[in-house]
Structure formats: C-alpha cells, structure tokens
Amino acid sequence: MKRRMFFSIILTFLLITTSFVLAQKEWVTVSESQWQGSFSDVFFFDAQNGWIVGSNATILNTTDGGKTWTHQPLPFNTEFKKIRFINAKTGWVVGENGTVLKTLDGGKSWMKLSTGTLVALLGVSFVDEQNGWACGDGGFIMHTTDGGATWTPQPIDTNNTIEGVHFVTPQIGWAAGGGGTLLHTTDGGNNWQFQTSATVNTLDAISMLDHANGWAVGAGGAVVSTVDGRNWEVQQSNVPNSNGMPEPIWDVHFADKNVGIAAAEFGVILTTMDGGITWKPLEHRPVAARLQGVHMISDSEAWIVGDKATILHTTDGGNTWDVVSNANELRAVHFFNDELGWAVGLAGSVMHTSDGGDTWRPQNSGDVFELFGVGFVNEMKGYIVGSNAALLETLDGGTTWKSVSDPGDEGHGRAKRIKFGGDMSWKSAMASYAMSFGNPTHAWAVGETGKVMRTSDGGKTWVGVDIDPGFSGAGFNNLFGVHFVDEKVGWIVGFGGTVAKTTDGGDTWSITIGYAELQDIYAISSELAWAAGNQGTIMVTTDGGETWIDQTVPTEENINAILFIDEKSGWTVGDKGTILRTTDGGVTWLQRNSPTTNNLRDIIKTPNGTLWIVGDSTTILRY
C-alpha cells in the first residue's frame, strides 16, 4: 500500500512538473536587430568616440570603439542627415526642416538651434567651436561664427541642391551638389566660385584632406578628385551595374592621400590604396542595403552605415567587414535537416546556420533585390526565388549562389534551363514569391501575374506552367503561396482570393476566385487544407476545396504564413508579431505570447519538431 501511494505521489509530481514545463514553453528570440530605420551618417572623433545619425531622430553614440552603442533619445521626430564633432564633447547634427542640433557633452543632451530656415539640410562642416557651415536644397548654404547660435545664408549662383560642404580652415572650403556642381571659397563663403567637376552627375558627398587633396562622389558611380584644390579629374570607380546602370556612390572618406573607402548603393563598397587611381569593388558584399555614410579612423579601421539600420566595421582596410547591425526583412526560412537551415529576404539577404540555429551567418547571394522563397534538394543543392525574375542555385550549401535565369548567361548553358511555352518568357514572368518541394526532385515556384514554374528533375530544368488556360482570371493574379503534399497533389493561393489545386502534378488545375487576399496555404492531404491571408483570414476545406469555411481568429492583422503539424495542431504568423496556435484543427485559434512586434513572414518545422519563424528586422524565433 505504501509503495503504491509512493508511486502515485511520484506520478502526480511528474505530471505537475511536465504540465508546468509545457505551460512555460515560449518562443525564444535567436536574432533581432537592436535598431531599425535608416542610418545616414557616421562620425568618429577618435577610435573610441563615435556617433551615428538617421531617420526617426536617431542618434547613437559609442564611447568604447563601437563595442556598444547607446541610443540618445530626443523629444521630436526628424530625419537627420549629417553629424560632425570638433572634439569629444562638441558636435552638431543637421537634418530635415532646417534642423540643427548642438551638444556640449558628447551627445548626452542636445539643444535645438534657431536657423531661420525650413530647408532640408544635407551637409555640415565645422573647423572649430565657432565657425561652421550647413548646406541643403535649392542652392542653400548658411554660415555661423558663434557655434550655431546664429546663422547667415550665403549667396551662391545656383539653384542646384548642395549635397555636401567641407571646410579645411575658416576661410577655405568646397561644396558639391546637383548637376556636378563644385564650388570653392577662399574667404569663408562670402564669395563662392564655380570649379569644373568634369561630370554632370549629382555629387552627393565631398571629402577634403587639406587645401589641395580631395574627392567627390555621386550618381552614376561618379568619382572626381583634385590634387591642387582647383582642377578636378574623373576617376574610374569600377562600380558594378546591379540595376542595369552604375550604382550611385553616397559617401567617401580618406585616411590619407592614398587610402580611401567609398560607400554606394546595394551594399557596394569601394576601396583604393593609391588615392583613387584604382578603385576596387568589394567582391563579397556583407549586405545589399544602401550605404550612406563612411568614416575612416585610420588606414585600417573604418565604419559604414546605411539603410536597414546597417552598421559595418572593418579593421583590415576594408577587405572584410563585420555586420554590427542590419535590420533586414527575412521572408522565408527552410531547414533541410535539424542542423542545416537558410533564411532569405530583402536586399538579396541570405542567412545560414549549420548548428541547428544557434548561430546564423550571412551568405553572399550575388543578388541585390528581394528574395522570397528558399528550398534545398540535399545538403549542398538548393534554390532561391525572388523579384526581378531571380532564380538562384547553389551546389555547395550556399557558399556560392549563381543565377539560372539570366538570359545574358546563355553562353554558360544556364538560361536554357528555363523553359516557357507560348508567349511566356522568364523576364516577363517577373517575381517569384514562394516555392515548395513535393519531394527532392519535384519543386514548384509561384509569383507575379500568375507565374508558375516546376521542376521534376531536382532543378536541372524548370518549366513554365499555365494554370489557367480557360482565362478565369487567376492566370493574371499575383500568387503568394504554394504547398505540395507530394509530387502530384498541390495547392496555390494568391491575390483576389485565388485558390488553385492540382492532383496530377500540375497537368490540370481546378481554380476558385473570390475569397480574401490569401498569402499562404498548408495541406495535410488532397482533401484537408488551410489557407490564410489578409485581415486575419483563416479558412479550411475538408472536401478538397469544394467548400471553404472561415475560422474564427482573435486578430485582424494580416496573416502571412501557416503551418500544420498534423490534422489538429497548427500555427500561423503575421503582422505586428502575431502568433496564433490551434490544437483542434482550427476550431479555436489562440493568441500566443510573441517576443516581438515586428511583422512575421514565415514559419516551418524541422524533422526533430523544432519550429522556426522569420520576419522583419532580421527576426528569427525558435520554439
């Protein structure tokens, strides 16, 4: 009797403990950017003290060489453009609506100065605690001789926007801007004289080492330089043409007469070791965001900032860069097994884990546009789909990705692997928004204007599929979600409530239209499936799509992805950190605690049962 009571007590204890553990299981944040928004400029007074400014009145400060960054809150919302310090305590920030801020304590507190203008200020330069200049829209330059307490506009003979200004003494300075404008003054800006820039491209930034040596950069990959402060010559930037034309260069900074770094569009970083005679683009871009500000502390150490809260740091002269911050939007995640996973997103971003998600590292996709779907055939071979007709392939686990869709690459035999019938072409098909593997050899991708592709040989060839030969309208709708149960049975959903189903591997399709805009679908069998979409839409079919029943959902947020473990257990994720769960096939959906308010884009399950979610601001969650 005592033994039976003892085992009863132990069993009760184990049940209570197990229930407590299960009740306590929550989603855990593996990755999430600390910062959001766009960073426009970075400035270091010395190796330890630095500042970053950007959108939403953002000012970040470090006093330990960038190991930690502290946000300096302000009681207003303005987009800041440039920041400059003349010592570790005294600095100025300029931005939209004629905004000028000043600090005397290293940024612990900021005072807003009266400027008498609402012009968007884009550049600022101070040579000491009293003498400074700011420039902006409409050919605007203003000057202060009392540290910013009062400002006086200076007349210049142009209406072109002045993007940057740089003074080396209280008398000698330069300004650069629209239409290749270059201005020079030797009397503190009382008189500005035009200099020939040798380009008609907008010059977005100017950086002078001294009274003679300087560089200006801008649109169309323009780089011009001077060695005497008067005559400017064009330098060949060798900037890539990611979008069919040379990338704009947004900023440039030199450590000395030889070593310089330029920051450009789509994550392009240029370095020179000979004063710009030769510029070398970084082969593997750490990010693909717009890079707007660069500052060199020495010939080896530099910082770059840009869109998507990007902060980059190098200690080897720009050969390699650490990604300190990047708030990219991750759109899809895929695990081939419990250890190997990939997440893809905007600006060509690819994240990879080889340790079950404990650590994620960027991979270079070679693409700079949006990536929406990813899938792997085996540990080495995988595919990514995205905008601009992107179809990328890797044969080495993501170390290198190559396009299999570039018509200009037919000489290498890759473009011929894309086969479309009739009037359809790869380029006219535009973006792909999702992909699904029915098995290791059969995969599907869907996208813009009814685009559907399939492979039945593990990606060796991809064939275009017309799901709407009867012209019901679905063939022109954007398709956002696809899920195949096996190589024969699959579902597609999209704009206008489009639902398409095949039971013969895509040879024929049944189509219905008229539900809310649907973003994703998950099927357990040819009969049982759930679809999810905008404004909290979740619906279920138990008869193969003949009828759909709306399910009650405790949110009106857009639902972006849906996953079912079995016929009863399912999850959805959506905007503003929405996570829903059901344990009864969707009869009831309950809101789960979410560790983020970022939009969540995808959810998947690994073979061992671990769940993964990805979303905006490089959010990665594990359950």
Question: Where are each of the predicted segments found?
Answer:
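Residue-level hotspots at or immediately adjacent to binding/recognition sites across diverse folds
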Residues: A23-Y623
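Bacterial N-terminal signal peptides
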Residues: I9-T17
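Bacterial N-terminal signal peptides that target proteins for export
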Residues: M1-F7
